[in-house]
């Protein structure tokens, strides 16, 4: 199936870089809805690099507890409740561009975690 337009949405990196947190993502999600962008076809809210802790726990990526105190599942649920899709960033290397843990050699466990958080799109 072909789409008439590419996937459209908002990505945290373009404006905020690593300066992201749960409240900001909720505010940007709300703005996509209130400004009519969601209804115009913008469907993704994508959290880019700097969402994770600097070390894995038991092989799992861990959301930064200071930035995302409710966790990614709760944030994904919030995004979905607004009629949007939840996107996240990872990398195919050992580390992301910022030097945080990425998915190389952890692809299956990371995919399961992303799915359990309700992630719809992986950048």
What are these regions (language model features)?
Residues 1-17:
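An acidic-aromatic substrate-binding cleft motif
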Residues 27-123:
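Aromatic-lined carbohydrate-binding/catalytic grooves of carbohydrate-active enzymes
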